[in-house]
A protein has these predicted regions:
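Short connector loops at secondary-structure junctions
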Residues: 60, 96-99
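Radical SAM enzyme core and accessory elements
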Residues: 98-188
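Conserved AdoMet/S-adenosylmethionine-binding subsite of the radical SAM
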Residues: 1-92
C-alpha cells in the first residue's frame, strides 16, 4: 500500500500529521507513537530512491497542546532537525468543541483519569513553545539558547546549533563574534 501510494498517488509533496514527538502528548491526542512516523519516513525515502522520485514529505506539528511543556518542544526541534526538516506546517493548539484536549485546556484535568495536566494558555507560554519550530531561523537562535538555559536543557543547544560550545562561560558564536567586532569583550 505505501509503495503504491508514494510512487503513484503523490504529486510531489505528501503532507502527514504526526503532530508531536513526545509520547505523553501523543497519548493525550490519542495518536500513535512518533516511531511510526520514523518508519514511514524510511519507507517514503526508500521508495523515492528506488523509483527515482524527488518528492517531499511535509509533516504537520502542533505546539501548546495540553500536556506539552517547553522542554517537549525543545526535544521536538532536535528530533525534526535530525530528520532534516525545516518545519513549515505548524500551528498553535486551538480548542475545538467536544474533544478531550479542549476539556483539559479549560479544566486543567484529564476527564478520564482526573490527572492534573499542564497546558500553556498565556501568550508568553505559547510563544515560548512555538519558537522551537523555527530553530533554523537566526532570528530565534538567541532566544532559544536563553530558553534552553532557563529550562536547564543546555545539552540540546549543541544538537540544534552545532557551532555552539557548551563549556562553562563560553557564549555561542554569534554573541562572541559580535563582541569581538565591537570590542565590548576587552577588559578596561
Amino acid at each position: 500500500y505505501n509503495r503504491e501510494l508514494i510512487s503513484r498517488h503523490v504529486s510531489g509533496r505528501l503532507k502527514v500529521a504526526p503532530e508531536h514527538t513526545c509520547s505523553r502528548v501523543l497519548d493525550i491526542m490519542r495518536k500513535p507513537p512518533f516511531s511510526l512516523f520514523h518508519e514511514f519516513k524510511k519507507i517514503f525515502d526508500s521508495v523515492n530512491r528506488t523509483e527515482g522520485l524527488n518528492q517531499q514529505l511535509i509533516p504537520y506539528f502542533i505546539s501548546s497542546h495540553p500536556g506539552c511543556h517547553e522542554e517537549d518542544m525543545a526535544q521536538l526541534a532536535v528530533e525534526t532537525k535530525n530528520l532534516n526538516f525545516h518545519l513549515e506546517q505548524v500551528q498553535d493548539f486551538t480548542p475545538t468543541p467536544m474533544t478531550v484536549a479542549t476539556e483539559i485546556y479549560y479544566s486543567g484535568y484529564h476527564p478520564y483519569t482526573g490527572e492534573k495536566i499542564f497546558t500553556a494558555v498565556r501568550p508568553e507560554e505559547k510563544l515560548a513553545q512555538r519558537k522551537y519550530f523555527f530553530w533554523y531561523d537566526r532570528n530565534y537562535r538567541d532566544d532559544i539558547l536563553r530558553s534552553l538555559n532557563r529550562i536547564n536543557r543546555r545539552d540540546l543547544a549543541a544538537s540544534l546549533f552545532p557551532a555552539y560550545r557548551q563549556s562553562a562561560g563560553t557564549r555561542h558564536p554569534s554573541v562572541a563574534s559580535q563582541k569581538a567586532k565591537t570590542g565590548r569583550n576587552k577588559k578596561r
